[in-house]
Amino acid sequence: MSPFLHDAHALNRRQFVIRTLAVGAALALQPAFPQNVPGGRDRRSASPRKVIILGAGVAGLAAALKLHEIGHEVMLLEARMRPGGRVHTIREPFSDGLYAEAGAGRIPITHALTLSYIERFKLAVDPFYPESGGEVFLWNGKRLVVPHGGDPDLAQLQTNLTPRERKVGFGGLSKLYFDALREQVHALPEAGWPYPDFKRYKDVNYGEFLRRQGASPDAVAYLSQGFEEDSLLDFAHDAVSHAVPKLWKIRGGNDLLPRAMAEPLAQRIRYGAEVRRIEQTVAGVRVAYTAGGAQQVETADRLICTIPFTVLRDIDVSPMWSAGKAAVVRNIYLGPVARVFVQTRTRFWEQQGLNGFATVDQPMELWSPTYNQPGARGILMSYTYERLAREYSHLSPQEQIDRMVALLEQVHPGVRAQFEGATTWSWLNEPYSKGAFTVTRVGEFEDLRHVATPEGRVHFAGEHTSPWPGWIQGALHSGLRAATEVNEAG
């Protein structure tokens, strides 16, 4: 049986935040894939072109594979020394072959395009969340063990919830505050995103939306996980991918996908190539970049740029972008994400009937990525968002580790005694992304119409240009879309 057809368990508690914007909304919000299915046998191009692709992340690799398959000459320029971009699995400095995700961690069961690539490259998947074991809930200094799939007993916690919130519990807050929005989403036509009917929400952030309905500070903190300032439209849009019965991860590490995609393109990728200038001429495009300390220039008929706009805005271009494109390049926001990974001598929490995952009263998630990896040692890791992620990113690695170990000791007493080592990662501090994933803020949704439009011979791909920002699916979809544009260009 295909691993994608295994039983679909109930939503993990972390997903309840947006579970009410479910399958009906997903059908409305997700546009169709391009007709060129990955691995399909498209008709070879009658007029092959040379195409430079900036970035060997998932979007760039998807575009390159498709164009190469139909006869175009492709060259990828990648600043890093590895493929994958923000799909990045950390294996060092961990022992015994352990690994954890610094980048994209979850693959929704509804993301058929991503799963088709996983099947194409014969990779296996495992459930992202453990399917057994209790979880820890740490709120206002009170630690509580919650049975798998259950909700915390509010009588044992110090909370500042309203009477009606206490009545439904933490597990009912999403339903309490999203029922009306769910009905509105279901009623919308399939006419593209963002919908005109949603214009009344264009100046509303997520936290404000909750507070307008009487949500308490604790309810807002629990539901938003640090995304209070996120546009309500952005939150609703992203909710579709979360509100699924199952999330997967790739066995062996999510970076196995971009590594597999890069293998047939190995001689067409130039690593360590930092782009300095993009120039369009009447005849084509010129890209100036540095590699090995030397200035290099490449020319081509067309160019696909997958560089995040947070980085692209510092690259010289000639001629300048159109006004709409320049504005979105200048203003687009990539949310900060910081992660701390702690290796322990044993997975002692499992002997206590726990699976290692936890919910805390801070804008972060706590994961146990090694729950299904072989060996005795384990990793506990944090996934920190927004304000707190920015705060962590400004600390030294040792300060981040000390702070996280102190928190983990509250969640899983005994971490200090079992501690063997740790490492950190900040996408805000990573020079080739300067952020983790696109977050659309209040007032910015109307600018999105410019994010994916070509500029002359330059085409754009990447999660930020897709209907699924922040997801592998978005990167793949955008790469195929850009490849289609190039192939169909006159």
Q: Which residue stretches match the model-derived regions?
A:
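Conserved flavin/dinucleotide-binding core of flavoenzymes
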Residues: 19, 37-38, 148, 284-286, ...
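N-terminal secretory signal peptides
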Residues: 1-12
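Active-site/ligand-binding neighborhood in enzyme catalytic cores
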Residues: 174-277, 282, 291, 299, ...
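N-terminal Rossmann-like FAD-binding beta1-loop-alpha1 element of flavoenzymes
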Residues: 50-76
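Glycine-rich FAD pyrophosphate-binding loop
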Residues: 68-90
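N-terminal export leaders
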Residues: 12-29
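Flavin (primarily FAD) binding-site architecture
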Residues: 305-321
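Dinucleotide-binding Rossmann-like beta1-alpha1 core, especially the glycine-rich loop
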Residues: 95-170
